[in-house]
């Protein structure tokens, strides 16, 4: 029996609801960037290669950091990792609006935002698994709907 088994009855669903909202914001952040990218491209005078580079660096940086996020998620408080990553990528997203050139956009969007989001996933899914033993598949399926709504 873990400490997660001793929480009050509905708490695991409250945790799921909060993680659902966080995941919704995570996916909305990714999708809205694609929507505004033509405006950013025009405003900053970016080429097709530059726009593709931003997406490539985001994906590469994210892919490199996800295992590190999992490693850290196994050793430190997952709830604080989720909290810190949401705050970090939210602030990075806010500062993305202040970018005035390609390099700054790569740093803010790809490295800062992608880096923050990379630490979210492993801790997020681990928390769901911790709180939902017999309802794990159902909880994961509910959580996954945030991907499609976001």
PLM regions: where:
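Extracytoplasmic
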Residues: 14-48, 69
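Helical-face signature of the major facilitator-like transporter fold
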Residues: 19-27, 59, 93, 101-114
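Conserved glycine-rich helix-kink/hinge and helix-boundary motifs of the Major Facilitator Superfamily
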Residues: 20, 52, 83, 137, ...
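Residue-level signature of mid-helix packing/kink "hotspots" within the transmembrane helices
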Residues: 31, 59-67
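Juxtamembrane helix-start elements in MFS-like secondary transporters
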Residues: 47-51, 55
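Structural signature of transmembrane alpha-helices in multi-pass secondary transporters
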Residues: 55-58, 62, 114, 143-150
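Conserved MFS/SLC helix-loop-helix module at the cytosolic interface between two early adjacent transmembrane helices
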Residues: 64-103
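Cytoplasmic helix-loop-helix junction between adjacent transmembrane helices
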Residues: 108-147
């Amino acid at each position: 029996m873990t400490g997660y088994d001793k929480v009050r009855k509905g708490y695991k669903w409250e945790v799921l609801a909060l993680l659902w909202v966080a995941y919704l914001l995570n996916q909305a952040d990714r999708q809205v960037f694609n929507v505004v990218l033509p405006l950013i491209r025009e405003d900053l005078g970016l080429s097709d290669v530059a726009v593709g580079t931003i997406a490539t660096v985001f994906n590469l940086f994210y892919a490199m950091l996800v295992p590190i996020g999992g490693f850290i998620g196994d050793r430190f408080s997952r709830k604080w990792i989720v909290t810190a990553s949401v705050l970090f990528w939210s602030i990075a997203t806010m500062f993305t609006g202040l970018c005035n050139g390609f390099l700054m956009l790569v740093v803010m969007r790809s490295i800062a935002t992608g880096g923050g989001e990379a630490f979210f996933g492993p801790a997020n899914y681990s928390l769901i698994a911790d709180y939902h033993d017999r309802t794990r598949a159902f909880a994961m399926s509910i959580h996954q709907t945030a991907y499609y709504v976001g």
